[in-house]
Design a protein with these regions (language model features):
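NAD(P)-dependent Rossmann-like dehydrogenase/reductase catalytic/cofactor-binding core
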Residues: 204, 208-270
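Rossmann-like NAD(P)(H) cofactor-binding subdomain of soluble oxidoreductases
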Residues: 37, 47-48, 56-132
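Internal alpha-helical scaffold of NAD(P)-dependent oxidoreductase catalytic cores
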Residues: 103-113, 129-166, 179-216, 261
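Short acidic-hydrophobic, aromatic-tinged amphipathic segments that line or gate anion-handling sites
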Residues: 51-58, 157-159
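Small-residue helix-packing motif on alpha-helices
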Residues: 30, 59, 195-202, 224
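Short acidic capping loops at alpha-helix termini that bridge into adjacent secondary structure
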Residues: 26-30, 88-90, 112, 197-198
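NAD(P)+-binding Rossmann beta1-loop-alpha1 motif at the extreme N-terminus of oxidoreductases
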Residues: 1-54, 127-128, 190-191
Length: 270
């Protein structure tokens, strides 16, 4: 299976590094290219043991999956450059936010199978939650192959293209929202008199430990919370204080704003 990556930004790097580390593919079957900075691309490709090239015809020849990882505003120029080199074997996987399947196909002047994926930065540690939507002509075998590729850097959830906006908000932007919550937790902790570095290190380990509890347990998060909440205890007192605030409404506002912005960005390709 030959894979080609157009674009070598942070997200693209996380994805193809995860795929390489999974040992499911021969690195010799992976090809990288970017818009410029050949020296950096050469060094990175050699570090990973993969190929690099700026020859679009050679890249696309016999390529099974072509990842489109350029910045959205650079895509039209890329499409204009490669559209005459596209072959029937090429299936496209876009990680470009906001660009619809129809728009990408129109710019590439092709009806080849195309999938849109929305990973998050946790792909860098093999734990992305990636939303995916397939064009109607993406066959079952090809879907299985793509899902296997994505599982190399996390988990996958298949949704309709319209629902990628919600996935973008909940999991795509989710790490940043959680980081923000943890930031506030650190600030609040320092107000209790402990040193900031003590609080930050404690909360880092708290997050890691809690994540492992969630991962290893079959219980819901609600039940896990109840299991450590004693009536009349300190945890109950803190939860009672939290219950004075409508946290659901706060997160609904947060997620709705992200969904609306995703929709706005997608409308720019009309």
């Amino acid at each position: 299976m030959k894979l080609v990556f157009y674009g070598a930004g942070n997200m693209a790097q996380a994805i193809f590094t995860g795929i390489i580390n999974s040992n499911n593919l021969d690195p010799n079957d992976i090809y990288l290219t970017n818009k410029s900075n050949e020296a950096a691309l050469k060094d990175f490709a050699e570090q990973l043991g993969v190929n690099y090239s700026y020859d679009d015809e050679a890249l696309l020849k016999d390529a099974d999956y072509v990842f489109l990882g350029t910045k959205p505003h650079d895509f039209e120029a890329l499409a204009d450059r490669i559209k005459d080199s596209i072959t029937d074997s090429n299936r496209f996987i876009s990680i470009m936010a906001g660009l619809s399947i129809d728009y990408i196909r129109e710019q590439l002047n092709t009806n080849n199978p195309l999938a849109r994926i929305m990973p998050n930065t946790n792909a860098q540690v093999g734990h992305s939650v990636t939303g995916i939507s397939f064009s109607n002509n993406f066959g079952p075998k090809a879907k299985d192959e793509v899902n296997e590729l994505i599982n190399a850097f996390g988990s996958v959830i298949e949704v309709s293209e319209d629902h990628l906006h919600q996935v973008t908000a909940i999991t795509g932007s989710g790490p940043a929202f959680l980081y923000h919550v943890f930031e506030q937790y650190v600030k609040a902790g320092t107000q209790l008199g402990l040193e900031k570095d003590q609080v930050e290190e404690s909360i880092r380990n708290l997050i890691i430990g809690t994540s492992k509890m969630i991962e290893r347990s079959d219980l819901s998060m609600e039940q896990l919370r109840k299991n450590i909440t004693s009536k009349g205890g300190t945890t109950q007192a803190g939860l009672d204080a939290l219950s004075q605030y409508d946290l659901v409404a706060v997160f609904e506002d947060c997620l709705s704003a992200a969904v609306n912005r995703s929709v706005e960005l997608s409308n720019t390709d009309d």
